[in-house]
Amino acid sequence: MDSRITTILERYRSDRTRLIDILWDVQHEYGHIPDAVLPQLGAGLKLSPLDIRETASFYHFFLDKPSGKYRIYLCNSVIAKINGYQAVREALERETGIRFGETDPNGMFGLFDTPCIGLSDQEPAMLIDKVVFTRLRPGKITDIIAQLKQGRSPAEIANPAGLPSQDIAYVDAMVESNVRTKGPVFFRGRTDLRSLLDQCLLLKPEQVIETIVDSRLRGRGGAGFSTGLKWRLCRDAESEQKYVICNADEGEPGTFKDRVLLTRAPKKVFVGMVIAAYAIGCRKGIVYLRGEYFYLKDYLERQLQELREDGLLGRAIGGRAGFDFDIRIQMGAGAYICGDESALIESCEGKRGTPRVKPPFPVQQGYLGKPTSVNNVETFAAVSRIMEEGADWFRAMGTPDSAGTRLLSVAGDCSKPGIYEVEWGVTLNEVLAMVGARDARAVQISGPSGECVSVAKDGERKLAYEDLSCNGAFTIFNCKRDLLEIVRDHMQFFVEESCGICVPCRAGNVDLHRKVEWVIAGKACQKDLDDMVSWGALVRRTSRCGLGATSPKPILTTLEKFPEIYQNKLVRHEGPLLPSFDLDTALGGYEKALKDLEEVTR
């Protein structure tokens, strides 16, 4: 029996639903998750070692073998690549003496690529375990690696003043918030949280829900479902136990608004959860925080503890006997699919983040099979302000179908990237002027799963649910950028991030990505474009979850808005063989199949 594993199990009371937290602690202790500890973990959690390994293998950040004392994850997002990623990558390989995907012989360094880590406004960026380094350049890499070789820890390098990890100054030492405009809802002024909760507790739960319904607040995670209606459905569901979950798994490339909200206004978010708990009638809440934001965890835990000490969280909130509600932070471990609310719930239960078949919906059967309301970070912050200022105040902003304001995560080819609070209804051109975007050709709205729109064709369109729906990501590309290369990167992202549970997403995106590569290589014909349209429609129609259903959109939206980037690459199709057919490759595959068959039959 390993005493370290015993201690970890005791820390979580051998609760199977805390498996993700347990795996994080195991990896922190050993540097990876060794096979040797799985039987003891399994015995304590009443799981087989295979069950544990199956779950661990699903998540990007869990390692099954020693991968270096310092595990370096360099963001390889599109924005990183247009801001110096390649030079930084080469510097890392040069200074560590290894290639990406390798661990050095001395076991000091491991180099890994990772998708967007929520720092698109300050790329290139990397994680060394749970410590962040931004605005990287080759010279900075040389300095960081030299200090690591001298024995300094990543935290000592990023935080030379030795600031406590619970302090906002610690976070600010590593990451900039870059709040460019402070609108009326999220960052302006200080809310008297005690007075706000006292005001809410004077209302009946149904009146709180009615206020949110009247405000016309819609979910800020992307789907845009009525927040008040979701709460009402959850409240009306028959169950003594219900849950509220804050989705802080901000995995859509180009999005970082939730990171900034959790940094600059975390208590507004948490009090929004308390208000939801009062309205719905539940006692427990969870913040699902993406693994890339581990550096925020201690700071957020301190914010929660301060709320408990102030009587705004925990037992008898606001002095009301019987109103008990508390929040725990559940760390993710690097899985884009966990942005889907049902996959997130699976992860909270200590499982693979596999999307559930719907119905039933989470408000009917969610966490542990109980009614659960899952809302976005921005949604909860908006709730606090609505209950403070009133539904009419919020509804007066925006458009009739899109009330209030929207936080935009602006990045790419502009002079002022960062966070902008704008009213719904602002035009594309107005935002571009605001952020200093010159010579803009395209804007990726809502990340790769959203729309790639043309500035020339769509400049006067409005950001609103009824026109250009936006989950917060606003990524700008100028006329120098190769849009086909961007499409290829986005499709590669979906290939790698598919959970693999359904064939349309798992296999369809591989084929779609291959078609894009053929176009870039000058080996595609019109039939390939026709296939991309029909296959993309099939993936959209038949994928199991919403994330899979949006995965072909990088291709489909650029085919619609920028058909010339495809047409200019096509070759004429003559004869019986498609231009993409490679006889040598085909024969090589046949010969390999014969060899494999011979080995099997020996």
Curated annotation (Swiss-Prot):
Entry note: cofactor: Binds 1 FMN.
Catalytic activity, reaction form: H2 + NAD(+) = NADH + H(+)
A Pfam family the protein falls into: 2Fe-2S_thioredx
Places the protein is found: Cytoplasm
CDD domains the UniProt entry points to: TRX_Fd_NuoE_hoxF
Domain of life: Bacteria
GO annotations of cellular component type: cytoplasm
InterPro entries: NADH-UbQ_OxRdtase_51kDa_CS, Nuo51_FMN-bd, Nuo51_FMN-bd_sf, NuoE_N, Nuop51_4Fe4S-bd, Nuop51_4Fe4S-bd_sf, Thioredoxin-like_sf
Record: residues binding FMN: 332-379
Binding positions for NAD(+) per the UniProt entry: 219-228
SMART domains, A to Z: NADH_4Fe-4S
Keyword Metal-binding listed: yes
Assembly and oligomerization: Tetramer of an alpha and a gamma subunits (flavin-containing dimer), and a delta and a nickel-containing beta subunit (hydrogenase dimer).
Entry protein name: NAD-reducing hydrogenase HoxS subunit alpha
Gene coding for it: hoxF
